[in-house]
Amino acid sequence: MERYESLFAQLKERKEGAFVPFVTLGDPGIEQSLKIIDTLIEAGADALELGIPFSDPLADGPTIQNATLRAFAAGVTPAQCFEVLALIRQKHPTIPIGLLMYANLVFNKGIDEFYAECEKVGVDSVLVADVPVEESAPFRQAALRHNVAPIFICPPNADDDLLRQIASYGRGYTYLLSRAGVTGAENRAALPLNHLVAKLKEYNAAPPLQGFGISAPDQVKAAIDAGAAGAISGSAIVKIIEQHINEPEKMLAALKAFVQPMKAATRR
């Protein structure tokens, strides 16, 4: 959890926002997945958001569902994912690592065991995509017992009550949802986000990172101009993996070429 605090403090000093890529662990196979993560970090990723392959990913679009299917095809299991997480943590001791996942995977292990395992391998945060704030008590309590930040999604239409709950229960960062279909509608989307960012700040919420539909440097810049602490990009990165599935070296080069300007856009 503290890794997020020190990251945001360092970035503030350097007048930068955070660029956070999302990938599915084990896509397209364990070995290449580790190379992908090293490449993202070398290219400037400030933190990682990682998915554990799950058979019924509700909140994911087709791109990330395909990533899950590729990981399954490679025989990747949740147990292997935790081994990979331990390896990433050994190699990169300071980078914040977040998991984005579904409640079933947590239940399968037992809520407390799941968060204990996260703590053991060095995971900093967990966002359980299909658990709303009002049902989150057993998850967030187990998370805090094991030094893991519970992350909550702040939708663009969040009312005051929800904003207060997110501020009070969330740690690490707040996942600020871009308006649905933000691309091409940045100007319309910027207004409500400014308002949400101001409210979250007022209620002392964890720093907001804007996610969903972030695929170009100007969107990263817009998120930071609206007051977000950074931006999360998932589908755009997973698409690059998909496009170069049979060319592992080209894939890594393309990922690097994508991440560098995205990170550069966070510099004020």
Curated annotation (Swiss-Prot):
Active site location: E49 (proton acceptor), D60 (proton acceptor)
Descriptive protein name: Tryptophan synthase alpha chain
Transmembrane segments: none
EC number: 4.2.1.20
Cited HAMAP family: Trp_synth_alpha
Keyword Amino-acid biosynthesis: yes
Subunit structure of this chain's protein: Tetramer of two alpha and two beta chains.
Pathway: Amino-acid biosynthesis; L-tryptophan biosynthesis; L-tryptophan from chorismate: step 5/5
InterPro entries according to UniProt: Aldolase_TIM, RibuloseP-bd_barrel, Trp_synthase_alpha_AS, Trp_synthase_suA
Molecular function terms from GO: tryptophan synthase activity
UniProt function note: The alpha subunit is responsible for the aldol cleavage of indoleglycerol phosphate to indole and glyceraldehyde 3-phosphate.
Annotated keywords: Amino-acid biosynthesis, Aromatic amino acid biosynthesis, Lyase, Tryptophan biosynthesis
A Pfam family assignment: Trp_syntA
Cellular component terms (Gene Ontology): cytosol
Family statement: Belongs to the TrpA family.
Amino-acid biosynthesis recorded as keyword: yes
Enzyme class label: lyase
Domain of life: Bacteria
PROSITE patterns for this protein: TRP_SYNTHASE_ALPHA
